[in-house]
């Protein structure tokens, strides 16, 4: 049911953007044209960065208060849903808004989608952010999830930087995707023969 609702909101957002004549803007295009998307706002980024640690702890199975989430980690698909749902819940808990606090328009949390005509720009930004977050949840889950028996500590260490780097590709904190691990050191030379 949740997937159907999210899909419906995405189609509505796309239709609203098409009617308004607004094209999708990639983060690189936005920076080149001085257009700042809602999900690139420093205030909002602070919440995403803060929530990433909670989300990765929950979805990697390390959260003792949420043992039911550990069972969802059996596939990249389940892990991506866990990442998206946990991030959305954390942002809503922190009342993170999608608009700049300097803006006089109504502010909305992640969990509420405005319905009136005056709030169409906020609806468009909400749909854009949810799309980015959904895509990044899927990409991070695919990248970090190697097999059902992956160590939870390694999973948490991979999820947080990959999720942050995907949502904010302009902030080059870590290379995306992370480079492969360095090769193991060569074995020590054999001891000299005894004469």
Curated annotation (Swiss-Prot):
Highest taxon listed in the record's lineage: Eukaryota
Alphabetical list of Pfam families matching this protein: Nodulin (PF02451)
GO terms under cellular component: peribacteroid fluid; peribacteroid membrane
Gene Ontology process terms (BP): nodulation
Main location as per UniProt: membrane
Signal peptide: 1-17
Compartments, as annotated in UniProt: Symbiosome, Peribacteroid membrane; Symbiosome, Peribacteroid space
Keyword line: Membrane, Nodulation, Signal
Family designation: Belongs to the nodulin 20 family.
Protein's name according to its UniProt entry: Nodulin-20a
Provenance organism: Glycine max (Soybean)
Higher taxonomy: Eukaryota, Viridiplantae, Streptophyta, Embryophyta, Tracheophyta
């Amino acid at each position: 049911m949740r997937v159907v609702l999210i899909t419906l909101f995405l189609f509505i957002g796309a239709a609203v953007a098409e009617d308004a004549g607004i094209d999708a803007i990639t983060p690189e295009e936005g920076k080149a044209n001085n257009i700042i998307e809602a999900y690139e706002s420093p205030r909002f980024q602070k919440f995403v960065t803060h929530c990433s640690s909670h989300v990765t702890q929950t979805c990697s199975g390390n959260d003792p208060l949420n043992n039911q989430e550990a069972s969802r980690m059996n596939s990249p698909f389940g892990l991506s849903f866990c990442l998206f749902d946990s991030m959305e819940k954390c942002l809503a808990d922190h009342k993170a808004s999608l608009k700049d606090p300097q803006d006089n328009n109504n502010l909305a949390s992640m969990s509420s989608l405005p319905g009136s005509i005056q709030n169409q720009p906020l609806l468009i930004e909400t749909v854009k952010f949810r799309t980015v977050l959904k895509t990044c949840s899927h990409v991070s889950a695919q990248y970090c999830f190697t097999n059902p028996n992956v160590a939870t500590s390694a999973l948490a260490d991979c999820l947080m930087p990959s999720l942050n780097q995907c949502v904010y590709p302009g902030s080059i904190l870590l290379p995306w995707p992370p480079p492969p691990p360095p090769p193991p050191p060569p074995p020590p030379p054999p001891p000299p023969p005894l004469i």
